[in-house]
Design a protein with these regions (language model features):
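ATP-dependent carboxylate/phosphate-activation module, predominantly the ATP-grasp catalytic core
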Residues: 167-243, 254, 264-291
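Conserved N-proximal alpha/beta basic substrate-recognition cap immediately N-terminal to
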Residues: 42-128
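Flexible, glycine/charged-enriched surface loops at secondary-structure junctions
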Residues: 245-251, 295-299
Length: 318
C-alpha cells in the first residue's frame, strides 16, 4: 500500500521550534510503515527524515499537496494543530482512507470547553471549568482551541475571556495513555509526562506574579503503576464518548481518581518512545484498525525516556 503521512510543522516550516517533535513522530510512523512493506510519502518544506519520499510543500501549498497526493494513496494519516485538524482530516477522508479521527471527532477534541462538557456528561472525571477565581486557589489557563501545553499557564487569578478557559488545578501525577481507538480499542502504554512549571511575571496575567508557564518536556514509556487498568478504562471511555478513531493520546492527572485533562485526536510525541519498546509495528496496527481486527493486547519490553531537548538534538537540523 502507499501511505501519505502529513505532519504540519515539517510540511510548512511555519514554527521551527515544533519541527523536532514533528519530525520525530513523522519518522517513527514512516519507518514503521516501510518496515512492514508499505510505500510512504510525506509533505516537506525542507526537513528530511531518512525514510519514505519527501514531497515538496510550503506553508502556502501544504493543504493542496495533501489533497493532490491523497488521491494517489491507499491511506493517509495527518498530524496538525487541533484547530486545523478537522478540516485537514475532511480533505484526507474525501480522497483516501483516513487512518485517523473523523473531522467531527477531531473538532470535538479541539474545543477544550466542549470536550470537557462531553466527558463530564459521560461521567468521566475532568477538571471543573471555572468562571471566576477564588482567593487561595490555583487554576490552569489554556486556549479554548490549542495543542497540548501550548500557551498553558498555572495561575492564582485570571480574567474570564472567550479565547481562554480556566479550570481547577488538580494535584497529581502527570500521565498519558496512548491507545488506538475504534471498534475494538487497544491501549498501548501508560506514559509519564515530564511537565515543567516556569514562573513568569508577564504574559497572560501581567499584574499577577503567581503565573507559571506549563511546558511539556518529554516522557517515560511505559510508566509502571498498579492503577494501569483504571487509567486504561478511563482513556477508552473518553475516546469512545468523543467518537475518536486511530492513534489517540489521552492526557491524565492521576489523583484520587484519574482526571482527563486533554484528548489529542492524532499521534503524539509519546509514539517516539512507544515504538522503541513495543514489539508490534505501530504502522501495521493503524492499518489493521482500519481494515481488519486489532489484537487483544501488545507486547512491551523495557522502557524509554526522551526529552524535547533530545529531540532537538536529533531533528533540529535539516
Amino acid at each position: 500500500m502507499k501511505i501519505l503521512i502529513g505532519e504540519f510543522a515539517v510540511g510548512t516550516d511555519i514554527e521551527k521550534s515544533l519541527i523536532p517533535e514533528g519530525a520525530a513522530m513523522l519518522k517513527t510512523l514512516a519507518e514503521s510503515f516501510v518496515r512492514v512493506g508499505h510505500e510512504v510519502c510525506y509533505p516537506s518544506a525542507g526537513t528530511e527524515i531518512g525514510s519514505g519520499t519527501a514531497l515538496k510543500s510550503t506553508a502556502d501549498s501544504f493543504v493542496q499537496v495533501i489533497e493532490r497526493e491523497a488521491k494517489n494513496c491507499d491511506a493517509g494519516l495527518l498530524i496538525a494543530p487541533d484547530g486545523m485538524l478537522p478540516e485537514l482530516n475532511r480533505i484526507l477522508a474525501e480522497n483516501t482512507a483516513n487512518l485517523g479521527c473523523s473531522p467531527e471527532a477531531a473538532a470535538r477534541c479541539a474545543d477544550k470547553l466542549r470536550c470537557t462538557e462531553i466527558l463530564k456528561t459521560a461521567g468521566i472525571n475532568a477538571p471543573e471549568i471555572v468562571r471566576e477565581a477564588e482567593e487561595g486557589k490555583k487554576y490552569v489557563i489554556k486556549p479554548r482551541f490549542g495543542c497540548g501545553a501550548e500557551a498553558t499557564y498555572l495561575v492564582s487569578g485570571f480574567e474570564n475571556t472567550g479565547e481562554f478557559i480556566a479550570s481547577e488545578y488538580i494535584e497529581g501525577e502527570h500521565l498519558s495513555v496512548s491507545l488506538i481507538a475504534g471498534n475494538k480499542p487497544l491501549p498501548l502504554t501508560v506514559n509519564r509526562q515530564f511537565i515543567e512549571f516556569n514562573e513568569q511575571k508577564d504574559g497572560i496575567n501581567p499584574e499577577n506574579i503567581e503565573v507559571s508557564g506549563i511546558k511539556y518536556n518529554g516522557s517515560l514509556t511505559p510508566y509502571e503503576t498498579p492503577r494501569r487498568g483504571e487509567l486504561y478504562e478511563t482513556a477508552v471511555s473518553a475516546v469512545k464518548y468523543l467518537g475518536c478513531f486511530g492513534y489517540v493520546g489521552v492526557d491524565i492527572v492521576l489523583s484520587e481518581v484519574p482526571y482527563v485533562v486533554d484528548v489529542n485526536p492524532r499521534p503524539t510525541a509519546s509514539i517516539f518512545g512507544i515504538s522503541r519498546v513495543m514489539r508490534e509495528e505501530i504502522g501495521e496496527l493503524l492499518l489493521t484498525n482500519r481494515f481488519g481486527t486489532l489484537p487483544d493486547s501488545v507486547r512491551v519490553e523495557g522502557e524509554y525516556h526522551f526529552s524535547k531537548d533530545m529531540l532537538g538534538e536529533l531533528f533540529g537540523k535539516n
